[in-house]
Amino acid sequence: MASNFDGIINPGVASRIADLARSYQSAEPFRHIVIDDFLNEQFAGALLSQFPAFEKGNNLGDDGAPGRKSTFERISRLGEAYQALDRFIQAKEFLEFIGEITGIDGLLYDPFYLGGGTHENRSGQALHAHVDFNYHPSEGWHRRLNLIVYLNQGWGEDWGGNLELYRDPYQDPQPAVKISPLFNRCVLFDTTEKSWHAFDPITLPAEAANLTRKSIALYFYSRHRPAEEVAGKHTTHYVNRQIPDHIKAGHTLAPSDVALLRDMIADRDGLLQRLYAENSELRQAQDRGLSGKLIYLLKRYFVRFRK
């Protein structure tokens, strides 16, 4: 493997491309792979130590108030480790490396990190099942791959925050695969109209209440994609979490069930409020004429594509 990999990718990972490619191609419910100890251990540690403070990132919700999620897109503005990562993932050698694993040629790096970069989530946060936006907003490239590296040392099995992969959340509300967000674990998967993914609620115990779920999200594109995968341009498409199978007629609700149902109702209420607010803004923009419409559309575009 090229010297460009030295000190960043674990040599044991870089030396088994053929095995990784076979695993990737055969994975269900859609093509993906989990690679433990993905990065050089010291480099992964440097990324964690230089991870931006929660308050430094974009931590405002759609309502404009601080939330339980913070993202920082322009990672090249962070410490030396992030600058090295930024240089590395745009190099031809790395793009060809993940291209060999996934079978996708001509992969492109996103210099804007739209929707990507560092992601940090506090206890109580979850992410509903969704498929991602499918075209780069400014370049028009096809979005092809998600690569996530987790930076959570000592993460407990029952702390939630597990990446969930679905066949179809409309038909089956239970994930087909659950992946713990363990330190230096990489998850690489296709971005298609069928790559439904989420993470379940983070439930940190009192002794770990100061911790957060940390990850780095990298997205890759191409100028073309197979005709059978091409779809109309859309933003991120969410499906609200469904009622778990164990909650049915005759079931006695546990405190955790009640908390879950309250969160689900709050999520739906929040969605309705956002839709009503968006509709109201659109009507007001229409009343203001062309300039008002343009300002409204730009605001909505920003909110939807930063997710």
Residue ranges and their predicted role:
Residues 299-307:
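Low-complexity, charge- and small-residue-enriched intrinsically disordered regions
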Residues 146-148:
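Eukaryotic charged/polar low-complexity linker/IDR segments
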Residues 33, 75, 80-88, 132-137, ...:
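Active-site rim elements
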Residues 138-143, 153-287, 292:
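Catalytic core of Fe(II)/2-oxoglutarate
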Residues 1-21:
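N- or domain-start disorder-to-order transition segments that initiate the globular core
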Residues 49-52, 86-143, 152-154:
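Non-heme Fe(II) oxygenase catalytic core, chiefly the N-lobe of the double-stranded beta-helix
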Residues 32, 130, 197:
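Histidine-centered active-site/metal-ligand motif
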Residues 21-101:
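Non-heme Fe(II)/2-oxoglutarate
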